[in-house]
A protein has these predicted regions:
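Peripheral, non-catalytic segments flanking oxidoreductase cores
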Residues: 1-115
Length: 115
């Protein structure tokens, strides 16, 4: 019951985010376009507890998010990296930059579908 309520609320949140992003691009949206972008509803929850031997830690690895939107809630440990498309003061082009966690904040990743 709790998982179904979570799915319902998170699906609406993702829809609202997509509508805001695409709307800012000046694209008129209707339900068929939104359904095409969002595809089949999917929720994936990953939890990585602290490893007593950090040198043995294995994460998801370098990847891009294939869907439209990924919503992340980081813990205080961190481990989220972003590949830099352009050079800036923090990292060079093509380098991976760690994104430090902000307590209580959600990270919104734009996936391959929208990109």
């Amino acid at each position: 019951e709790v998982a179904l309520e979570y799915l319902k609320l998170s699906s609406q949140m993702v829809r609202d985010i997509v509508e805001a992003l695409i709307g800012r691009l000046g694209v008129a949206l209707d339900d068929s376009k939104i359904k095409g972008l969002l595809g089949q509803k999917m929720v994936n929850m990953n939890y990585y507890p602290a490893c007593p031997n950090p040198e043995l830690t294995v994460g998801v690895g370098r990847h891009s998010d294939m869907g439209a939107i990924t919503v992340l809630l980081q813990d205080g440990i961190g481990g989220l990296y972003v590949k830099m498309e352009e050079e800036n003061e923090d990292a060079g082009k093509g380098e991976w930059l760690e994104i430090p966690p902000i307590p209580g904040a959600l990270v919104i990743n734009i996936g391959d579908t929208i990109e």
